[in-house]
């Protein structure tokens, strides 16, 4: 008997139940008589929100000084898994220095709508990118002996009524869009805990959803860790235990502990189920205790430099007519309070108390830049007086270049509520338009956690998207504006022209009881590219101060089967005069003719550093899963036999290379034949196709010999026949004979 099982055997029922809930907001319970310690967990994901006095889970009370790293909206835009892992390592070391056993992150909910108030804490609209980046973060943190808690499992894609709303989603969209990031992280990086979400999923709370917490998470994905509730997400504690929820957070006053004891005593809860939950909780507790390393020292000054370096890799250059990088000899005007007081993080449970913050104005002053400053609009609201506008215009007119620092005030986007529009504050849009009348050289720097409408984008000289870049955002901004660093971030989400273009527009945020995911699998670029909806900036977009050329695409084979791994290689070259990094992106397109698939899906990416004139070969691998969609009839991933296209590019709307492969699968879709089964379904199945081909042979021969019939008309006729069900044979042959045919076909399928 191992240590934990032996401890459980010595526990009273009440002690077992007690371990299934927290001691307070941040600690697990201890049992002194058995030498079971308490361990601490704190909010992340982009820093430590450790509270030592009054505690809460919403970021209301003060926390210890820590380093605030860029939020996920920024780090995902780096497209750099190594950078994400290094950030995780640094966060893990900071946790060790503060005696914290678990960091509550990463957050991998898909950015379904740009209005979600918590989008700044999430990684991407694309599950592949989110999964890769989350896995790297988890590896980094846990390499330091600190646990993680990937969240919020699952479909917590809005803040409106997040604690009671039911996310109504198809099985296919669940599997293709909303679960893969969790699946990737669980299988590849084994987070110590998984945090279930507040909301319902198709009518059942996530904290009580056995299909989600046990059937998928544990049985399908093989997860061995602990499932913890979001703070206050438990509704029926006994049902939650039975579903697979191990640890309730925070402390519920002992009420739910007593419910567990009562359920066991009354025979409504098998004590073995409770024992399993206790074992998983103790695995977390003892891992935290045994892997605590007080020798690890975290230096905040060093970590601040890392935060600034990371943000430098994350910022996205959206527009540039050549004005950037700025010449240090030019007189530059900084306009907008964000230049002095940047918005560097979001509101809510992830809110960090930074030990320092460097603004762009600070950084310019430290380097002796020729910069004047006009505050003129507040970062806290949507207000600007005529006097403030006049001063801003004078300042802009007197400069060679005006840099306007715009973005969303914290009150516009935060945990707990959603935005109501994609617009910037009206005063900011007006200021930009007015400055353009007196100053042709206008650069806009954005601080926001989610896409915004940019009606003036075609008029300004450059736009630099900093997102919420952490406490070193000003240093990173200065480096990028003046060319000390080359922008290399790429958008991890699409910027539509307007909110109404977003695929979730008709359904977000629901009717108060439920929110229908009516766009199904067509989220983000999957919708825009397939529907051919013009967008302001595409997924993967981002400019550089240099240029890159692609060539020599090579596939390891022109054919592929279920078990094969295809190697895709190509060359990328820096054809400019500036050192830079290109984010190469690999997409897959299904050319088999299945209508309900996106025109392309991201299945690979890499960030490649290149000196001027340097060329490198990039290689990526593709498996059958990468070609597949989730087939509900099969209950599994399925790629039909046929042609697939490998696309290599700079963004989802900027494909540079492509090549086709032929894929052959041994999988067959399940089929049960009856009078409503179509000829097309039977012709597409290898076991029934010979019988139906023979049956339809006379009809095919007659059509082939018909005089005056064009090939196009013949194809239309073939399609009509394919769509006919077997019941149309009635009248052509006796009904009993049709029944006999159906029986014959089902026998063939059963073989």
Where are the regions a protein language model picked out?
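Short, solvent-exposed helix-helix connector turns and helix-capping sites enriched
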Residues: 80, 126, 209, 418, ...
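Phosphate/pyrophosphate-recognition segments in soluble nucleotide-handling domains
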Residues: 295-302, 378-380, 658-685
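In a subset of proteins, long, contiguous C-terminal domains/tails are tracked
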Residues: 524, 540, 544-545, 577-579, ...
């Amino acid at each position: 008997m191992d240590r934990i099982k032996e401890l459980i055997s010595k526990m009273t029922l009440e002690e077992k139940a007690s371990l299934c809930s927290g001691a307070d907001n941040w600690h697990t319970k201890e049992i002194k008589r058995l030498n079971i310690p308490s361990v601490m967990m704190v909010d992340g994901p982009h820093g430590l929100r450790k509270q030592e006095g009054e505690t809460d889970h919403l970021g209301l009370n003060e926390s210890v000084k820590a380093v605030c790293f860029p939020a996920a909206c920024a780090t995902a835009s780096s497209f750099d898994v190594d950078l994400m892992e290094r950030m995780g390592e640094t966060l893990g070391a900071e946790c060790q220095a503060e005696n914290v056993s678990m960091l509550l992150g990463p957050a991998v909910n898909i950015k379904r709508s740009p209005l979600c108030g918590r989008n700044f804490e999430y990684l991407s609209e694309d599950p592949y990118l989110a999964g890769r980046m989350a896995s790297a973060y988890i590896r980094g943190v846990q390499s330091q002996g600190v646990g993680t808690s990937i969240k919020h499992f699952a479909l917590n894609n809005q803040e409106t009524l997040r604690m009671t709303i039911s996310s109504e989603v198809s099985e296919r969209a669940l599997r293709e869009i909303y679960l893969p990031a969790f699946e990737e992280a669980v299988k590849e990086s084994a987070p110590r805990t998984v945090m279930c979400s507040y909301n319902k999923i198709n009518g059942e709370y996530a904290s009580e959803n056995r299909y989600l917490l046990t059937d998928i998470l544990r049985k399908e994905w093989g997860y061995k860790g602990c499932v913890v509730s979001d703070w206050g997400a438990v509704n029926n504690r006994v049902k939650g235990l039975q579903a697979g929820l191990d640890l309730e957070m925070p402390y519920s006053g002992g009420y739910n502990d007593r419910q567990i004891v009562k359920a066991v005593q009354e025979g409504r809860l098998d004590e073995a189920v409770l024992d399993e939950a206790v074992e998983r909780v103790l695995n977390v507790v003892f891992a935290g205790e045994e892997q605590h390393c007080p020798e690890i020292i975290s230096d905040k000054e060093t970590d601040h430099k890392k935060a600034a370096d990371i943000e430098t890799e994350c910022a996205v250059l959206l527009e540039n007519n050549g004005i950037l990088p700025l010449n240090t000899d030019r007189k530059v005007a900084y306009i907008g309070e964000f230049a002095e007081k940047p918005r560097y993080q979001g509101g809510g449970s992830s809110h960090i108390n930074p030990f320092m913050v460097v603004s762009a104005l600070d950084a310019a002053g430290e380097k002796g830049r020729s910069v004047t400053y006009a505050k003129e609009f507040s970062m806290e609201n949507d207000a600007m007086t005529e006097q403030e506008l006049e001063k801003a215009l004078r300042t802009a007119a007197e400069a060679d270049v005006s840099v306007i620092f715009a973005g969303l005030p914290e009150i516009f986007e935060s945990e707990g509520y959603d935005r109501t529009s994609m617009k910037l504050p009206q005063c900011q849009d007006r200021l930009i338009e007015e400055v353009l009348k007196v100053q042709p050289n206008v650069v806009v720097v954005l601080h926001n956690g989610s896409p915004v409408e940019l009606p003036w984008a075609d008029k300004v000289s450059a736009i630099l998207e900093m997102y919420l870049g952490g406490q070193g955002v000003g240093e990173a901004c200065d480096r990028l504006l003046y060319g000390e660093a080359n922008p290399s971030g790429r958008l991890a989400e699409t910027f539509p022209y307007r909110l109404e273009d977003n695929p979730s527009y008709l359904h977000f945020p629901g009717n108060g009881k439920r929110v229908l995911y009516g766009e199904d699998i067509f989220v983000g670029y999957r919708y825009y590219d397939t529907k051919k909806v013009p967008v302001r900036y595409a997924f993967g977009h981002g400019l550089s101060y240099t240029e890159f050329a692609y060539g020599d695409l090579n596939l390891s084979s022109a054919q592929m089967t279920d078990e094969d791994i295809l190697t895709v290689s190509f060359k990328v070259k820096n054809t400019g005069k500036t050192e830079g990094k290109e984010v190469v992106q690999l997409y897959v397109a299904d050319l088999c003719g299945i209508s309900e698939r996106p025109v392309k899906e991201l299945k690979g990416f890499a960030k490649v550093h290149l000196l001027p004139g340097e060329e490198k070969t990039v290689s990526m691998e593709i498996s059958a899963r990468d070609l597949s969609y989730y087939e509900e009839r099969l209950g599994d991933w399925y790629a039909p036999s046929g042609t697939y296209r490998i696309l290599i590019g700079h963004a989802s709307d900027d494909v540079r290379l492509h090549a086709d492969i032929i894929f052959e699968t041994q999988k067959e879709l399940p089929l049960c034949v009856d009078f409503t089964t179509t000829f097309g379904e039977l012709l597409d199945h290898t076991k029934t196709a010979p019988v139906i081909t023979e049956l339809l042979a006379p009809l095919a021969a007659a059509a082939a010999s018909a005089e005056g019939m064009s090939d196009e008309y013949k194809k239309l006729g073939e399609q009509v026949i394919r769509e006919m069900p077997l019941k149309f044979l009635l009248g052509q042959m006796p009904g009993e004979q049709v029944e006999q045919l159906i029986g014959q076909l089902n026998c063939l399928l059963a073989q």
